[in-house]
A protein has these predicted regions:
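Solvent-exposed soluble domains appended to multi-pass membrane proteins
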Residues: 9, 16-19, 24-290
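Membrane-interface segments at or immediately adjacent to transmembrane helices
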Residues: 1-6
């Protein structure tokens, strides 16, 4: 069975269709992988600007907000009282996978440390596995998280599911300084700096997320085992001044499923995030029949 790596990229979405003055190269790796993907499309998520746990729980369990009722606002508060939580992780465990999560933030936040073992995760690598020197802005860099994941994969012979929850592009964006270097790397037409300061910070981190995607792709190609890479955004960022000045995004994010094997023309399919786990299982199972 293939190695499976899934990245839940903090505040990731493609802002270029909404703001055409953004340099297209900001997401050059994402564009390339999208063209090579097994499946890609827009992703409907139950969160806007925050509340990652709503998107995360829908992905891992396949449960919609309607299923959760009043617990839709913090599903893990309910899940922490359960003894076993069915979903994607349990399915992968039954298929022989060792399931681990990498998230550079305290494990107790959202009670993940209580919920994840009940989902079937074997290990949780939280902020204790990273140093303050590995920050980019306010949080651990995507580069550091990618490097950690690559080393983990390179040093095991086990059949692995690695679930990565990044933090670098988490706000508040206005607390950060403007990115160094020429703004031309972020924009083709420099916007009003007063209205776009948060956008510049966001795009700087978005470009780092794009580099992370490229790092993971290159590493998975080198593994002896075939691999599947899933990538999606949990929600759009909070950038109220940007939205008021330049327009609001739809609230959808993007996803892609890329494989090191048998990829022809990508399937285009817009999904709800609670459907994404099934799509990833399909990408794995297709390998069995080939």
């Amino acid at each position: 069975m293939p190695t499976l790596v899934v990245v839940q990229s903090e505040s990731f979405f493609d802002p270029r269709p909404v703001y055409p003055f953004i340099n297209p190269d900001v997401l050059s790796a994402f564009d390339r992988l999208r063209e090579q993907s097994w499946q890609t499309g827009a992703l409907n998520v139950p969160a806007w600007g925050a509340n990652t746990v709503r998107t995360e729980s829908a992905f891992l369990t396949g449960l919609t907000p309607e299923h959760l009722g009043v617990h839709r606002f913090n599903p893990y508060h309910r899940f922490a009282r359960e003894t076993h939580i069915p979903g994607l992780v349990a399915e992968l465990k039954a298929m022989g996978y060792r399931c681990v999560c990498i998230h550079p933030y305290p494990a107790g936040f959202y009670r993940r440390n209580e919920v994840y073992p009940k989902m079937g995760f074997d290990a949780f690598y939280d902020i204790q596995h990273f140093s303050p020197e590995q920050k980019c802005g306010q949080y651990t860099s995507d580069e550091a998280v990618a490097d950690f994941a690559v080393k983990l994969l390179e040093n095991t012979n086990e059949q692995m599911f690695v679930y990565i929850i990044t933090m670098e592009n988490h706000g508040p964006l206005h607390l950060e300084s403007q990115p160094e270097g020429p703004l031309s790397r972020l924009y083709t037409d420099i916007p009003d700096t007063n209205a776009s300061s948060d956008l510049s910070v966001y795009l700087n981190h978005l470009q780092n997320a794009d580099r992370m995607l490229q790092t993971l792709q290159k590493a998975l190609i080198q593994l002896p085992r075939p691999a599947v890479l899933g990538w999606f955004g949990d929600h759009v960022p909070i950038m109220e001044q940007v939205y008021e000045h330049y327009g609001y995004p739809s609230g959808q994010t993007e996803y892609l499923i890329w494989r090191t094997f048998s990829t022809d023309t990508p399937q285009q399919a817009d999904l709800n995030v609670d459907e994404l786990g099934v799509a990833l299982l399909d990408a794995l199972v297709c390998r069995i029949g080939e």
